């Protein structure tokens, strides 16, 4: 707790930060050039507690696509949407995160096919269902512009995926409407040896750079 409030309540009420809960339990072994999520035990109970008792707004769940493989990509997206519907039915909004590895030798083709499959699943959703997406910055600029306009989609955010901070920000700036959800790139210059002043200055500089790329 923080100042007598549960963390999620403090984040939203005091800081205006939407609370998100990571619910996946890591990645399964690679098959068909992808890694699905491992089974998530007691998901229904976790979601009920998160939403009703802790006021969590959304969830995050990650899988990875390493190469172009239609069956693998279909499996990833099917699993993501299955979990997303369970999250929605529990009263929260899922962040669907099918990361396309930046070293994928057929990254552009994988992203294009993934988008086709995503659109197939979106078309089957009831009109009231909402989801978010956290995606690798695409090889083809503005690939996800149409996805952002889908009425089911609350937001499309970008993961840094192993790109350096400079490169991630540059690539993001070329994709209008995508905003950063960087962790690796955000933290790349932080060191435990830094003084409080150095740490704070590094954080502020990263935020400024990433924010500028998000609104470009």
Regions found by a protein language model. Name each.
Residues 59-137:
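Eukaryote-skewed repeat-based solenoidal scaffolds used as protein-protein interaction platforms
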Residues 1-57, 65-68, 117-135, 139-216:
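Alpha/beta catalytic barrel-like cores
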């Amino acid at each position: 707790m923080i100042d007598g409030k549960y963390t999620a309540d403090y984040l939203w009420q005091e800081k205006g930060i939407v609370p998100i809960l990571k619910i996946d339990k890591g990645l399964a072994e690679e098959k068909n050039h992808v890694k699905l999520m491992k089974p998530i035990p007691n998901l229904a109970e976790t979601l009920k507690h998160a939403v009703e008792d802790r006021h969590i707004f959304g969830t995050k769940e990650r899988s990875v696509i390493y190469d172009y493989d239609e069956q693998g990509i279909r499996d990833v997206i099917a699993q993501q949407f299955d979990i997303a519907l369970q999250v929605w039915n529990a009263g929260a909004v899922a962040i669907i995160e099918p990361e396309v590895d930046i070293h994928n030798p057929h990254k552009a083709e994988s992203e294009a096919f993934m988008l086709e499959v995503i659109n197939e699943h979106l078309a089957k959703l009831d009109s009231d269902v909402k989801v978010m997406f956290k995606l690798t910055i695409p090889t083809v600029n503005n690939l996800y512009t149409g996805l952002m306009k889908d009425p089911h989609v609350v937001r499309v955010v970008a993961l840094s995926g192993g790109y350096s901070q400079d490169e991630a920000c540059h690539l993001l700036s070329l994709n209008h409407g995508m905003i950063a959800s960087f962790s690796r790139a955000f933290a790349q210059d932080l060191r435990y040896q830094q003084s409080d002043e150095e740490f704070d200055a590094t954080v502020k500089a990263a935020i400024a750079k990433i924010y500028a790329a998000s609104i470009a």
